[in-house]
Amino acid sequence: MRPHYEDLANNLLSLGEEVRSVVVTSPEPGAGCTSVCLGLGAALAGMGRRAAVVDCNLENPQLHHMLGQPNFVGLTSGLQGDKPLEHYGREAVPGLLLVPTGPVPPDTATRLETRRFVEAVRGLERERDVVILDAPVAGKVLESPTLSRGFDGILLVVHASRTSRSAAHGTTDDLLDAGADLLGVVLNGWV
């Protein structure tokens, strides 16, 4: 799988320096967004780039599960505190910072619509070459002006055996109709 993620990283980097923050979403849960985020981040780090993966899926956080880590601190801690978001993550491998969601209080979804969230991500952009935002499903991204249009672009992950063509096409159309900058579609689960 590593060469596929390296290809994805090269394609992303070929878009230029103006692409610093990328939202990764899918038409439905289970398409493998978190895996794609981790693979892309590791590939970027392996190429000498400084990357960060931030779990923004507050309804169904997965990053800490995949890492076998507790979810005591992370994005939500950074949104409540005054320290940079980088402080609430950990360097998994040289060049790859991983920031889980942290504790998820009931009103957390609205916190992604705050200036503090955008400032926290922009702060990471100053420290990292690419910030990868592991987002909720596309329907939730479309409900969020910050996630759908507040960053440099969106990667849509579709799963080869789980995502129907109609769901993939419909979600692509919905994102484009909403004015999102769709950078590409990643086919996951195909070998």
Give a label for each model feature.
Residues 39-40:
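Short amphipathic alpha-helix
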Residues 36:
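Hydrophobic positions on the alpha1 helix immediately C-terminal to the Walker A/P-loop
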Residues 110-191:
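Conserved catalytic-core segment of NTP-binding enzymes
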Residues 43:
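Rossmann-fold NAD(P)-dependent oxidoreductase module
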Residues 1-18, 25-31, 46, 50-126, ...:
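P-loop/Walker-type NTP enzyme "switch/lid" segment
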